[in-house]
UniProtKB/Swiss-Prot annotation:
One of its GO terms (biological process) is taxis. It comes from African swine fever virus (isolate Tick/South Africa/Pretoriuskop Pr4/1996). Belongs to the asfivirus DP63R family. This is Uncharacterized protein DP63R. Pfam families: ASFV_360. It comes from the Viruses. InterPro entries: ASFV_MGF360.
Length: 73
């Protein structure tokens, strides 16, 4: 999920509704915060699974730290 957000995912409302239906209230709340930065890493223009796997292998969480900072204030 964090990888998708860092790539610029923007379906937070839809994902929040799904999280609510699955009784994932914390996730629903996090998705509703609207504090995520988009375009932190270049968008993946090549949907090739091999290229995505390379991105995931070298991936460092970015937006998850935003959530922790928000909760720890």
């Amino acid at each position: 999920m964090w990888f998708c957000i860092d790539l610029g995912a923007d379906a937070f409302k839809e994902a929040g509704v799904l999280a609510g239906k699955k009784n994932r209230r914390v996730l629903q709340y996090i998705l509703g915060l609207n504090i995520f930065k988009r375009e932190l890493i270049p968008p993946c223009k090549d949907p090739d699974p091999y290229q995505i796997q390379i991105l995931l292998k070298n991936y460092i969480l970015k937006n998850v730290s935003t959530v922790f900072t928000y909760y720890c204030q």
